[in-house]
Curated annotation (Swiss-Prot):
Extra information: During catalysis, the active site Cys acts as a nucleophile attacking the alpha-carbonyl group of tRNA-bound glutamate with the formation of a thioester intermediate between enzyme and glutamate, and the concomitant release of tRNA(Glu). The thioester intermediate is finally reduced by direct hydride transfer from NADPH, to form the product GSA.
Keywords of the record: NADP, Oxidoreductase, Porphyrin biosynthesis
Catalytic activity: (S)-4-amino-5-oxopentanoate + tRNA(Glu) + NADP(+) = L-glutamyl-tRNA(Glu) + NADPH + H(+)
Name this protein carries in UniProt: Glutamyl-tRNA reductase
Gene3D superfamilies: Glutamyl-tRNA reductase, N-terminal domain, NAD(P)-binding Rossmann-like Domain
Length: 468
């Protein structure tokens, strides 16, 4: 089996590509089930945010799994596979573990250190768990990633290096408007991103908020929450956008809808002050033509991506990265140690069978042996065998936790002629430093999977069946 991460993010793809591939909440279950219907995918969950779309999967073969994931994403986005893979990356084995831990820690975010991604991973896993597309491998991986993210935020000050994309967008709006205190804001969308934006607006001292949402009850619920916190707020239907925009100084959009929600027809640019749009949707909620209107400024994910692409983490990011590296080593060591357990179990089973056979032989040779004597002999033989096996079985578990340690389990199976099916161990290609090798662009990986082209991508792990 192979652990794969296949995806796109702000690091590898422009917003125009990301918004085509973005998977809305109402589509996520369908995409997950389509992945599981493919020939090589055994488990899967998908993280789709404003900055990334990533599939975490357990596949029977590396290249088969890669082809399955890329074809599903291409079909979903309506893109050609070759065009899409130019912007995609793949991590496998330990590198996939390291990537997810880094994402959970906020180290791979557009705004380094933002904590929102933790909730997004938790929600993504929850959807997959409910859909029945995750098994033991991804369950353990996702839960450990969430623990790593929490530890990083608890033990470092990485939060101070970046709150969220929302805070960065509102900081730009504050600059354009000369401050947000007392201003009027229209919030389009009342989902998780909308809730985060509402909280940021409240902290910025916004004067009043109107919430427009497709589902009226959700918009009213968010408005009530703001009113409870002392911010005047009300909710309107989406068909009231034009009048609400004419009233607002700031419009924050985060609907997750497919296609533009705000067009030039919604915006009046007559005798009024500056109007700022913070478009946090993926795909974008605001039509590109809106940015060309006089007096209008649009801050969107593409704007933030350009500005933050050169952002470098400070000392807290380095501390966070050290924690991630430590956690990756620990996780991989634990996985390798767990993988040798079937071999140890098979060895002890073989020893017990030998003891039982010898005791039966003793019974046939000495049928008159008294019961208490026979029982003491049996206990003695079993104690001797247990003591002989104790040191090597403990040691093999310790050695198995080191890079390349699976070879010790192989040696045990060979020496004691253990059934490889009974003592199956899933191998993972490891680098000398304990981190599994395994990252490349999807284009490189797909070329490496083509006949006659395997040498183009070095260090690919051995695969099952025809992919070996």
């Amino acid at each position: 089996m192979n652990l794969l991460t296949v995806g796109l993010s702000h690091h590898s793809a422009p917003v125009r590509v990301l918004e085509r591939v973005a998977i809305g909440a109402d589509e996520l279950g369908k995409v997950l089930h389509e992945l599981l219907q493919r020939d090589h995918i055994c488990e899967a969950f998908v993280v789709s945010t404003c900055n990334r779309v990533e599939v975490y999967a357990v596949a029977e073969t590396f290249h088969g799994g890669l082809e399955d994931v890329t074809s599903v994403l291409a079909r979903h986005s309506g893109s050609d596979v070759a065009e899409l893979t130019d912007h995609m990356y793949v991590f496998y084995a330990g590198a996939a573990v390291e990537h997810l831990f880094s994402v959970a820690a906020g180290l791979d975010s557009m705004v380094v250190g933002e904590a929102q991604i933790l909730g997004q991973i938790r929600q993504s896993y929850g959807v997959a768990d409910e859909a029945g597309t995750v098994g033991r491998t991804l369950h353990e991986l996702a839960q450990q990633a969430l623990r790593v993210g929490k530890r990083v935020h608890a033990e470092t000050g990485i939060d101070s290096e970046g709150a969220s994309v929302v805070s960065e967008a509102l900081a730009d709006a504050e600059t354009e408007l000369g401050g947000l205190a007392g201003r009027r804001a229209l919030l389009v969308g009342a989902g998780s991103m909308g809730g985060l934006a509402a909280a940021q607006l409240r902290r910025a001292g916004i004067g009043e908020v109107v919430i427009a949402n497709r589902t009226a009850v959700n918009g009213e619920r968010l408005a009530e929450s703001l009113r409870t916190d002392g911010v005047p707020a009300s909710a309107v239907a989406l068909d009231g956008l034009r009048s609400a925009i004419s009233w607002a100084d700031l419009v924050v959009t985060c609907t997750g809808a497919v296609g533009a929600v705000v067009t030039t027809e919604h915006v009046e640019t007559g005798d009024r002050g500056p109007l700022v749009f913070c478009d946090l949707g993926l795909p974008r909620d605001t039509a590109p033509e809106v940015a060309e209107l006089p007096g209008v400024t649009v801050v969107d994910l593409a704007t933030l991506q350009r500005r933050l692409s050169e952002q470098q983490g400070g000392n807290e990011s380095e501390r966070a990265a050290a924690i991630v590296a430590e956690e990756v080593r620990g996780y991989l060591a634990a996985q390798r140690s767990a993988e040798v357990t079937p071999t140890v179990t098979a060895l002890r089973k073989r020893a017990a069978e030998v003891v039982d056979a010898e005791l039966l032989r003793l019974d046939s040779k000495l049928p008159a042996l008294e019961g208490d004597v026979r029982d003491e002999l049996a206990r003695t033989v079993r104690r001797v065998v247990d003591k002989l096996l104790h040191a090597p079985t403990v040691r093999v578990k310790q050695l198995a936790s080191t890079p390349g340690g699976s070879g010790y389990a192989d040696a045990l199976r060979e020496l004691f002629e253990l059934d490889p099916q009974t003592a199956a161990v899933l191998g993972t290609a490891q680098a000398d430093d304990g981190r599994a090798r395994g990252s490349a662009s999807v284009a490189e990986a797909r070329r490496a999977g083509a006949p006659g082209a395997r040498d183009e991508l070095r260090d690919l792990p051995a695969q099952d069946g025809d992919d070996r």
